[in-house]
Amino acid sequence: SQISLRGSNLTI
């Protein structure tokens, strides 16, 4: 899944 954190994209 992809999570948006402070404008950064984290793909986990």
From Swiss-Prot:
Glycans are attached at residue 9. Its main location: secreted. It comes from the Eukaryota. One of its GO terms (molecular function) is aspartic-type endopeptidase activity. Disulfide bonds: none annotated. Keywords: Aspartyl protease, Glycoprotein, Hydrolase, Protease, Secreted. Chorionic epithelium (trophectoderm) and placental cotyledons. GO terms for biological process: proteolysis. Its EC number is 3.4.23.-. It is found in: Secreted, Extracellular space. GO terms for cellular component: extracellular region. On the 2D-gel the determined pI of this protein is: 5.7, its MW is: 50 kDa. Belongs to the peptidase A1 family. This is Pregnancy-associated glycoprotein 50C. It comes from Bison bonasus (European bison).
